[in-house]
Amino acid sequence: MKIIAKKDLFINDEIRVREVRLVGLEGEQLGIKPLSEAQSLADASNVDLVLIQPQAVPPVAKLMDYGKFKFEYQKKQKEQRKKQSVVTVKEVRLSPVIDKGDFETKLRNGRKFLEKGNKVKVSIRFKGRMITHKEIGAKVLADFAEATQDIAIIEQRAKMDGRQMFMQLAPISDNK
């Protein structure tokens, strides 16, 4: 049973329905009970009555220690946030007239970024009259993509944006 967000839960006296489908401490079904009987069962067991599915017909309420539940819920959320990995986009800037050695250095940097799980935006800035030779820039980007095809896929093909041509690569492991 999926439990909704903690701020949407009604507890004990906050519950305003006539009858509830009651779930016990161990998750067993106790049947449909009037609210007063469910509340007295909760008081007798020294636990809280928590409305966990208010939109169901009849609404579902569970006997539980709300303080403990809230603590476990927050702990679980914290663990999930820890496990989340943030994918950043790193940029490698090239020139349409880049030399082989410089290209190899930029390629090595791009490969490092991809191996760490980051996406790589490869951009070429055209200066002055270079803009008339867009095919040279496209060839440089194609060479970069070909050199990284074993560890990356092209997420966004080469495209012009003003005086800049760029493409985006993503590590293969992210897309499996």
Curated annotation (Swiss-Prot):
Keyword annotations of the record: Cytoplasm, Initiation factor, Protein biosynthesis
Matching InterPro entries: T_IF-3_C_sf, T_IF-3_N_sf, Translation_initiation_fac3_CS, Translation_initiation_fac_3, Translation_initiation_fac_3_C, Translation_initiation_fac_3_N
UniProt-annotated location(s): Cytoplasm
A molecular function GO annotation: translation initiation factor activity
Superkingdom: Bacteria
Pfam families to which the protein is assigned, alphabetical: IF3_C, IF3_N
SUPFAM superfamilies xrefs: Translation initiation factor IF3, C-terminal domain (SSF55200), Translation initiation factor IF3, N-terminal domain (SSF54364)
PROSITE patterns: IF3
Record keyword Secreted present: no
BP GO annotations: ribosome disassembly
Principal place of residence: cytoplasm
GO cellular component, one term: membrane
Family note: Belongs to the IF-3 family.
Function: IF-3 binds to the 30S ribosomal subunit and shifts the equilibrium between 70S ribosomes and their 50S and 30S subunits in favor of the free subunits, thus enhancing the availability of 30S subunits on which protein synthesis initiation begins.
Quaternary structure annotation from Swiss-Prot or TrEMBL: Monomer.
Descriptive protein name: Translation initiation factor IF-3
